[in-house]
Structures are given as C-alpha cells and as structure tokens.
C-alpha cells in the first residue's frame, strides 16, 4: 500500500495512522500519545483547509468561465459571489450554484418557462463547461 501526506482516504487509513503515530510518539505513554493526537488533528485541519482552498480556487475558475459564457450570450448574469451553501459542500470537484431567476418575479417566471430561453441558458453553460474542461484537463487517479 502507498500513502501520501493528506487527509485520510478512509477510516482504515486513519486508524492505521493513529496506531503508527502512537508507536512513534511514545507507545503507551498517554501524555505523548495525546500530544501526538493533537498534532495530528491540527495537521488534518491544515490539510483540510488546503484542500478547501484548492476547491475554492477551482470553483472560482469554473464560475468565471461560466459567467463569461453566459454574458457573451446576452444572458443577464448579475454577479459572482461566495457563500457556504449546503448543496456545494462535500463535492469532490469544482462546484457552482447558478441562480437563473426567481419564479416569484412574473417577468422572470415567463422567461424561465420559455423553451428558447432555457435552451440559450443551457447552451451557454454547456459551452462554458467545455471551455473549462479544455483549460483544466482532468488527471485520472
């Protein structure tokens, strides 16, 4: 098996790391084990923050490409923002939430019920996704 310094890939990997770290940090010495565990928890937090920053960066790049594609097609895209939406958490890839209008606004509801308008939106986003994938090729595991 191969391991790299990163967040644990599964529970077994975490258990193994805790066991091995315990052996290196003083075996059954409870104080040493507790200190090592605190260091491990801090490291996991730092690695999690780094992975989150990478995900935010990739999501920002995708958002910029999609925003540009939508604006280029004449769609009214207001702004690019950031917020901790639940539906965006835990995605292992760039993730974007796109608000296309409000059904409570009669004018926007009419647009959103138009097949040609929806086709235009979908075409713009599909074009943006293709552009993003070409600019950021996926590396297989």
Language-model-detected regions and their locations in the chain:
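Active-site-proximal helix/loop segments of hydrolytic enzymes
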Residues: 1-141
